[in-house]
Structure formats: C-alpha cells, structure tokens
C-alpha cells in the first residue's frame, strides 16, 4: 500500500466551509472536495476513495504518476445541475467524470503535474443504489471512484466492446480491493 499523508487546508483557504483534503501517494494526487453536508456522515469516505484510485492507478497500463485529479463529493441536487449543464440530462446520476484535455507535446521535468480531470459523486444516489443492489456503501463508493477514474484515463462504455473492456477492468481492480463483482445480480434474500 502506498505511503499516504493527509492534510486539511486551513479554514481561511476553504471556500464557504467546504472540507478540502489533499491526499498524496506515488499514484495520482487526489484532491477531495466535500461540498454536501450529507457526506459528513461517512467519515471514512476519503480513505475509501484514495484506496480505490491508488489501486486502479497501479493496475492500468497508463502512466498516472505525477498526475492530479479532483473528486467532488456532492448531493443529488449538485450532480443534477452538473448533469443538466454538461450532458443535457436534467436528473441526478451516481457519478460524472470530466476528463482534462491531454497535452499535445511531451511533458518536461519542470512542467506542472498534469491534470487527469474531475469526478463528481452523488451521495443520495450512491446510498440508494447500494441499498437496492445489496452492496455496502464503501464497496459501491469504491466502484464509482474506479469507474470515474477509468473515464478520466480514456475508458468508455459507449459500445458493447468498450463496455466489456471497461467492466472487466473494473472487476479486476475491485477484486484486488476484495470487493465482489459489481455487475453480478444481487443475491436473493430468503
């Protein structure tokens, strides 16, 4: 497991009381911004996300070291606004990814870290889906973080072939985290 350090920004550096945490490791620097109070009930969410991103970064055939990404933990109202503004869909969703533009030339040693992009995750939708699918909150959060990360590095699921490739990689990453297949049907309760 990578060496993890966590520091919270001083209150004067935060906007409007938002909790702002930077987590650093040998894999991408992951900035987590909590913008919805409902996330405060999930004290370990940041650590779950970091572990999922670090594991995913270590398993993909892409250079993600010395890169950065930002994850916004929001609510259904916040993600609905993003979904409407960026995708034209006026409804909440579980996760949205916004990949950054890729550099056109070589990266030089003095260049700033490259930005992979941004991910937004909606608390209520995540919580509801986890319950409906009989998954733990942390397992579903890990899945959504991995799913969003894979979008940032170029994976997609627009075609059956793309979906098969992306879902297979998600299963492998989540298995490494000890999380069951997220696409398997939920077990029946008797």
Swiss-Prot record:
Q: Quick check: keyword Nuclease in the entry?
A: yes
Q: Name one GO biological process term.
A: rRNA processing
What does the record give as cofactor?
Answer: Zn(2+)
The entry's free-text remark on the cofactor is:
Binds 1 zinc ion.
SUPFAM superfamilies under this entry?
Metalloproteases ('zincins'), catalytic domain
Q: Which InterPro entries match?
A: MetalPrtase_cat_dom_sf_prd, YbeY, YbeY_CS
Q: Which UniProt keywords apply?
A: Cytoplasm, Endonuclease, Hydrolase, Metal-binding, Nuclease, Ribosome biogenesis, rRNA processing, Zinc
Q: What does this protein do?
A: Single strand-specific metallo-endoribonuclease involved in late-stage 70S ribosome quality control and in maturation of the 3' terminus of the 16S rRNA.
Official protein name in the record: Endoribonuclease YbeY
Q: Which organism is it from?
A: Nitrobacter winogradskyi (strain ATCC 25391 / DSM 10237 / CIP 104748 / NCIMB 11846 / Nb-255)
């Amino acid at each position: 497991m990578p060496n993890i350090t966590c520091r919270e920004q001083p209150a004067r550096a935060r906007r409007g009381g938002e909790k702002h945490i930077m987590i650093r490791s040998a894999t991408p620097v992951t900035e987590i911004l909590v913008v919805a109070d409902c996330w405060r009930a999930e004290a370990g969410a940041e650590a779950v996300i970091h572990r999922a991103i670090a594991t995913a970064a270590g398993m993909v055939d892409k250079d993600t070291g010395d890169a950065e990404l930002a994850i916004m933990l929001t609510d259904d109202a916040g993600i609905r606004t993003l979904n409407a503004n960026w995708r034209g869909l006026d409804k909440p969703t579980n996760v949205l990814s916004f990949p950054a533009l890729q550099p056109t030339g070589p990266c030089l040693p003095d260049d700033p870290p490259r930005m992979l992009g941004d991910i937004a995750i909606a608390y209520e939708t995540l919580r509801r889906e986890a319950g409906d699918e009989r998954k733990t909150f942390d397992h579903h959060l890990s899945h959504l973080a991995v799913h969003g990360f894979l979008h940032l590095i170029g994976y997609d699921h627009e075609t059956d072939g793309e979906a098969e490739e992306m879902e297979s990689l998600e299963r492998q990453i989540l298995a490494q985290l000890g999380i069951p297949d997220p696409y398997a049907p939920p077990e029946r309760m008797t």
